[in-house]
Amino acid sequence: QDLDHVFMRF
């Protein structure tokens, strides 16, 4: 999933 990417974006 892209959950990891969502957090990395912050």
Swiss-Prot record:
Disulfide pairs here are none
Report TM segments: none
The UniProt keywords, alphabetically, are: Amidation, Neuropeptide, Oxidation, Pyrrolidone carboxylic acid, Secreted
Which positions bear Methionine sulfoxide? 8
Main location group: secreted
**PTM section of the record:** Occurs in three forms: Rhopr-MS has unmodified Gln-1 and Met-8, Pyro-Rhopr-MS has pyroglutamate at Gln-1 and unmodified Met-8, Pyro-ox-Rhopr-MS has pyroglutamate at Gln-1 and oxidation at Met-8.
Q: Which residues carry this modification: Pyrrolidone carboxylic acid?
A: 1
Q: Which GO terms describe its biological process?
A: neuropeptide signaling pathway
Give the family per the record: Belongs to the myosuppressin family.
**What is its biological role?**
Myoinhibiting neuropeptide.
Protein known as: Myosuppressin
